[in-house]
């Protein structure tokens, strides 16, 4: 196979080589070894395409490992491949060791065939038992027949061996050529009319395939052209304003990419998602749907999704990574939706990506035959105006259909099944229907603190400039929080001179930042002798017509879900060449076929900003119309629609009705961004700027009053919708993402009075905001409102993107928090130390949950200080971090001086025996701790002895969790001695600790003298079934 042809991915080859044995014969594969490798075998059988699985079946059938009845059971349409693989393993295992060995051999043969097809033996074309010979030579016959099924069917039909109906069934477009060949052989097996003898003779006469068509010159030529095309499209990164062209290799900065974890799944606690490299996009375990082909990357607007895909394309085109794919086809969803004509898979790939100069039929057939070597990427699914549905099936790769039907069936796998697809989108655009067809989901969370610094250093090579910018960000937490999104880091880089020279303070809100970039563009478009030093009224007023033209175009585009504008659309919006020269409209990254030089806004957020600008200043927009903006969805479709009064969703009459219609048709996530910008523009901070541009100050006052009323009303309706608390319990509510955007809008307006009014309406004891894409900017907005609460609240922000910068933004509201939950938020020692420094003075705060972050021993001194100083502190949960014995020893010193702590969680750290000893010594006479977890901390018998001494002295501890350690019998015997003297412990968890019957016997003796303990967990230890029954009968408190 040529260089372009490549081979299976290195990971797959390595996994297969381990599973398939060290010798060709696999004679050492016993049933026990086979069963022990079951999960790996399932993964191997489903890791490729259905073609690979059916090849394994071919070999097993030819060797008579499978009977015909067995084989037919694996051809139920619609069954997931993983389900079929497990059934195959069950069937083979039940047939004994010989069958297990043959399955391993079949997998070897199928893998070898997929990489370098071998010529298999011949057969007697005049055999007296043709059906039996078709079966025994099945792999070779499928290989010989697969390119000639059409001709063979025609010939068999002419001679009366098959009916037209049977031909049509075999020719269904959902089948690959190899699958059609197999179905023809299957038909010959069950028909007794001479079809088997006919095939045996005529297949022998077919030409022998020398190699896969990947070797053909036309295929090699096309693959080379495709690589060149993709390389040209991805090698250079055009900045948002199109003013610079940078080498992607020089400027690309890794984002925080994490795999989405289903926290609802049963099983042991999961570690915090590791920050993944782009190269791990297709090799990450933990699939949502093993039978799906689509990888989803979600991220907020400006988080770097498009650049991530561009990097992927470049790595593939340069031969540096993703070489398991021979063909990569990149597409933009905002470009796809402009295609009005019906199109097929063939049209999409060839006419809208890369055209084969010769051999189109052969190349397309190659793509259909080897879909597992194909990758399609679809950028910006949130900008695709059609909502995903799986109602309309389309399975023909050659028949044309609408662009939305084509895309949706590609994502479902009805077209090009087993080809990988990567889709990027903002989270709000991903429906539950689409998630059914997602193999793996990733979160792109923007830059880390190190990423922001690295990006700025790559952008600025001038002496001292990058250092001054980084220092400015570190001193300005609000601006630093914005920069975790790459689009804001670009703005900071673009406006570095204005930021470093300004004296009025750094930007605080998103609106401030966009006005700064507006100032930058306006100043650069103004003659030097007339340019002012800032965004003054005269500068803005001078280009107001241009800004309103751009705003009208932006608003029309949002309402029509249009993000690429043709010359005719620009003309209709009165956008002139002079308006375009300002720089906010740039050439679209892809060209719509048949159009000339389409333009798009720098970024979707700029389109929302200009739409908000138009709504704030256009004389054609009556103030009352702004109420539509906060409807954020079509009536009845969105939770936001139910938050507002009916009057807010009624269309206005007359000249503003078209604007009302646009606002009602726009996508909710775009309306939310626009609403936040509008609130910022109408803030007191920017009142003077807008007043000078508005002919009627009264109209501007009415707009401002309307926005305030609408925000207050929306929040009040939201709070009133919260159901009352159960008697005796605190009111708890999980806020919806729409609530986050209302708070964001309030923060952009910077109205303390409104924030206090909103806080008065929030009468809850527990506010949950898990999985709400809360980043540093959202933290600043939450703190802006929550700091005015009259009653303490438990704030739960698990599974977000708070980070160290976000923690700093939350500090203003820490005084009203009685509990703070920050699970899975990529927080390090730096952020927690700042948090604790503030918490020392917050008497209300009694609980901290920090599991699944990046904490190390570096924060232990701060934790110890918190415990020693705050004698009303109740719970500290530090599970699944990176704390070792050194950190545990420091924390133990804080415990010695603490008299209030009731819950201490250390599971999933690395404290070991020394750490366990230090904690045990500190807790021996502790008067308040009721629950202690040291699960999964590499604790052995030495640590168990120290914990036993603690149990003998402690009179308060009620639950001790020690699962997933290495206590063994020696450690359990020590604990048993401690239990004999303990009078408070109710639950002892010892699962998965290599305990035998000897250790259990010691526990039973202790239980005879201890009436307090209610449960001892011993699951996952080394007991036989007989021992389990025996132990369970002796004491029901043993949970086995």
UniProtKB/Swiss-Prot annotation:
Effect of residue 725 to V: Constitutive NF-kappa-B activation
Reported impact of residue 429 to T: Abolished NF-kappa-B activation in response to muramyl dipeptide stimulation
Name of the protein: Nucleotide-binding oligomerization domain-containing protein 2
The organism of origin for this protein: Homo sapiens (Human)
Effect caused by changing residue 703 to C: In IBD1; uncertain significance
Phenotype upon changing residue 655 to E: Abolished NF-kappa-B activation in response to muramyl dipeptide stimulation
Sites of S-palmitoyl cysteine lipidation: 395, 1033
Outcome recorded upon mutating residue 714 to N: Abolished NF-kappa-B activation in response to muramyl dipeptide stimulation
GO cellular component labels: basolateral plasma membrane; cell surface; cytoplasm; cytoskeleton; cytosol; extrinsic component of plasma membrane; Golgi apparatus; mitochondrion
LRR repeats: 791-812, 816-839, 844-865, 872-884, 900-920, 928-949, 956-976, 984-1005, 1012-1032
Classification of source organism: Eukaryota, Metazoa, Chordata, Craniata, Vertebrata
Pfam family, one: NOD2_WH
GO molecular function, one term: pattern recognition receptor activity
Result for mutant: residue 605 to P: In BLAUS; hyperactive
Outcome when changing residue 348 to V: In IBD1; uncertain significance
Effect after changing residue 949 to M: Abolished pattern recognition receptor activity
Mutagenesis or variant effect for residue 889 to P: Abolished pattern recognition receptor activity
Resulting phenotype, residue 968 to H: Abolished pattern recognition receptor activity
């Amino acid at each position: 196979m040529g260089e372009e042809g490549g081979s299976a991915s290195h990971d797959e080859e390595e996994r297969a080589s381990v599973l398939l044995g060290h010798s060709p014969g696999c004679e050492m594969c016993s049933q026990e070894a086979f069963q022990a490798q079951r999960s790996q075998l399932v993964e191997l059988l489903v890791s490729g395409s259905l073609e690979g699985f059916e090849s394994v079946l071919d070999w097993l059938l030819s060797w008579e490992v499978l009977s015909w009845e067995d084989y037919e059971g694996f051809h139920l349409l619609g069954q997931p491949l993983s389900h079929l693989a497990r059934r195959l393993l069950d069937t083979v295992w039940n047939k004994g060791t010989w069958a297990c060995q043959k399955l391993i051999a079949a997998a070897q043969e199928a893998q070898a065939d997929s990489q370098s097809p071998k010529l298999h033996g011949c057969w007697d074309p005049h055999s007296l038992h043709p059906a039996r010979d078709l079966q025994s030579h099945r792999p070779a016959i499928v290989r010989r027949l697969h390119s000639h099924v059409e001709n063979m069917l025609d010939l068999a039909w002419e001679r009366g061996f098959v009916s037209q109906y049977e031909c049509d069934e075999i020719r269904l477009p959902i089948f690959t050529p190899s699958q059609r060949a197999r179905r023809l052989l299957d038909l010959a097996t069950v028909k007794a009319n001479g079809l088997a003898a006919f095939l045996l003779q005529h297949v022998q006469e077919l030409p022998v395939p020398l190699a896969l068509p990947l070797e053909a010159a036309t295929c090699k030529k096309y693959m080379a052209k495709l690589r060149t095309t993709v390389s040209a499209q991805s090698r250079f990164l055009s900045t948002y304003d199109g003013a610079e062209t940078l080498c992607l290799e020089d400027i690309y900065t890794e984002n925080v990419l994490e795999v989405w974890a289903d926290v609802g799944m049963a099983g042991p606690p999961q570690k915090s998602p590791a920050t993944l490299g782009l190269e791990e996009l297709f090799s990450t375990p933990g699939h949502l749907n093993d039978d799906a082909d689509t990888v989803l990357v979600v991220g907020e607007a400006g988080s770097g999704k498009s650049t991530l895909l561009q990097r992927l394309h470049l790595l593939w085109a340069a031969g540096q990574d993703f070489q398991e794919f021979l063909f990569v086809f990149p597409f933009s969803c905002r470009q796809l939706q402009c295609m009005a004509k019906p199109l097929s898979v063939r049209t999409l790939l060839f006419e809208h990506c890369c055209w084969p100069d010769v051999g189109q039929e052969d190349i397309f057939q190659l793509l259909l035959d080897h879909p597992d070597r194909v990758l399609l990427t679809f950028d910006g699914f949130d900008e695709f105006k059609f909502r995903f549905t799986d109602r309309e099936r389309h399975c023909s790769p050659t028949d044309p259909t609408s662009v939305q039907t084509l895309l949706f069936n590609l994502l479902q796998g009805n077209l090009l099944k087993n080809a990988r697809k990567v889709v990027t989108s903002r989270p709000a655009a991903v429906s539950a229907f689409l998630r059914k067809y997602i193999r793996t989901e990733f979160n792109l969370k923007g830059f880390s603190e190190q990423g922001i610094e690295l990006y700025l250093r790559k952008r600025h090579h001038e002496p001292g400039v990058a250092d001054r910018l980084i220092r400015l960000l570190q001193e300005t937490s609000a601006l630093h929080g914005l920069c975790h999104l790459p689009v804001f880091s670009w703005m900071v880089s673009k406006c570095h001179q204005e930021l470093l020279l300004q004296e009025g303070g750094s930007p605080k809100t998103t609106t401030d930042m966009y006005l700064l970039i507006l100032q930058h563009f306006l100043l650069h478009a103004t003659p030097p002798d007339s340019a002012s030093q800032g965004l003054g009224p005269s500068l803005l007023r001078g280009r107001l017509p241009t800004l309103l033209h751009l705003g009208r175009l932006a608003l029309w585009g949002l309402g029509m879900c249009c993000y690429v504008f043709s010359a005719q659309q620009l003309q209709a919006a009165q956008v002139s060449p002079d308006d375009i020269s300002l720089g906010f409209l740039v050439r679209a990254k892809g060209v719509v076929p048949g159009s000339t030089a389409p333009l798009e806004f720098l970024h979707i957020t700029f389109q929302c900003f200009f739409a908000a600008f138009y709504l704030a200043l256009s004389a054609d927009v009556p103030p009352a119309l702004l109420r539509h903006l906060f409807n954020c969805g079509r009536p009845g479709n969105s939770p936001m629609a139910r938050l507002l009064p009916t009057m807010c969703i009624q269309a206005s009459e007359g000249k503003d009705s078209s604007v009302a219609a646009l606002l009602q048709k726009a996508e909710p996530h775009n309306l939310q961004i626009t609403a936040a910008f509008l609130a910022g523009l109408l803030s007191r901070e920017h009142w003077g700027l807008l007043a000078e541009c508005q002919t009627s100050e009264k109209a501007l006052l009415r707009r401002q009053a309307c926005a305030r009323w609408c925000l207050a009303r929306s929040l009040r309706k939201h709070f009133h919708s919260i159901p009352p608390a159960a008697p005796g319990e605190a009111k708890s509510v999980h806020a919806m993402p729409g609530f986050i955007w209302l708070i964001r809008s309030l923060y952009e307006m910077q109205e303390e009075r409104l924030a206090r009014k909103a806080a008065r309406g929030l009468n809850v004891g527990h506010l949950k905001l898990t999985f709400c894409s809360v980043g540093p900017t959202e933290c600043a907005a939450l703190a802006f409102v929550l700091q005015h609460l009259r009653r303490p609240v438990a704030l739960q922000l698990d599974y977000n993107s708070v980070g160290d910068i976000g923690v700093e933004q939350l500090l203003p509201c820490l005084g009203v928090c009685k509990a703070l939950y920050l699970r899975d938020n990529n927080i390090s020692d730096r952020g927690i130390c700042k948090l604790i420094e503030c918490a020392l003075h917050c008497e209300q705060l009694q609980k901290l949950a920090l599991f699944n972050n990046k904490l190390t021993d570096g924060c232990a001194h701060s934790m110890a200080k918190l415990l020693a100083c705050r004698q009303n502190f109740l719970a500290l949960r530090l599970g699944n971090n990176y704390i070792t014995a050194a950190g545990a020893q420091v924390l133990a010193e804080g415990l010695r001086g603490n008299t209030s702590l009731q819950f201490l969680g250390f599971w999933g750290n690395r404290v070991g025996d020394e750490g366990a000893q230090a904690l045990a010594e500190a807790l021996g006479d502790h008067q308040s701790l009721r629950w202690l977890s040291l699960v999964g901390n590499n604790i052995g018998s030495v640590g168990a002895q120290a914990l036993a001494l603690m149990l003998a002295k402690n009179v308060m501890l009620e639950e001790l969790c020690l699962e997933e350690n290495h206590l063994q019998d020696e450690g359990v015997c020590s604990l048993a001695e401690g239990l004999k003297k303990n009078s408070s412990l109710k639950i002892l968890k010892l699962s998965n600790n290599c305990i035998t019957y000897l250790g259990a016997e010691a526990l039973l003796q202790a239980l005879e003298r201890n009436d307090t303990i209610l449960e001892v967990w011993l699951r996952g230890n080394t007991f036989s079934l007989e021992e389990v029954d025996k132990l369970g009968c002796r004491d029901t408190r043993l949970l086995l």
